[in-house]
Amino acid sequence: MSSRISVSLLLLAVVATMFFTANVVDATPRSQGNMMRYGNSLPAYAPHVLYRFYNSRQFAPINKRNNAEVVNHILKNFGALDRLGDVGK
């Protein structure tokens, strides 16, 4: 019986310590200089940032090219290479 009491008291002490330290950390004051300087200029929610991110190219569907477009791309961009110069002739 005494072991149950000691374990419960130890558990209660640990929970109380965690509760009080969490409240102390949450209660630390913020510097008023930064809040006055930046607080009013920054919006709380900026959906345009999300729209710009999700409309970027990495989320766009992949467009497949046909073989002629691939060959034209290679000839246009790598035409200076000797081996690729005579592909279309």
UniProtKB/Swiss-Prot annotation:
Signal peptide: 1-27
Entry annotated with the keyword Signal: yes
Disruption phenotype: Delay in the timing of the reproductive peak of egg-laying.
Disulfide bonds: none
GO biological process: adenylate cyclase-activating G protein-coupled receptor signaling pathway; locomotion; locomotor rhythm; locomotory exploration behavior; parturition
Keyword ATP-binding listed: no
Domain of life: Eukaryota
Assigned keywords, A-Z: Signal
Function: Probable ligand of isoforms a and b of the calcitonin receptor-like protein, pdfr-1, a G-protein coupled receptor. May not signal through isoform c of pdfr-1. Involved in locomotion; may play a role in circadian rhythms of locomotor activity. Modulator of egg-laying.
Protein name: Pigment dispersing factor homolog pdf-2
Organism: Caenorhabditis elegans
Name of the encoding gene: pdf-2
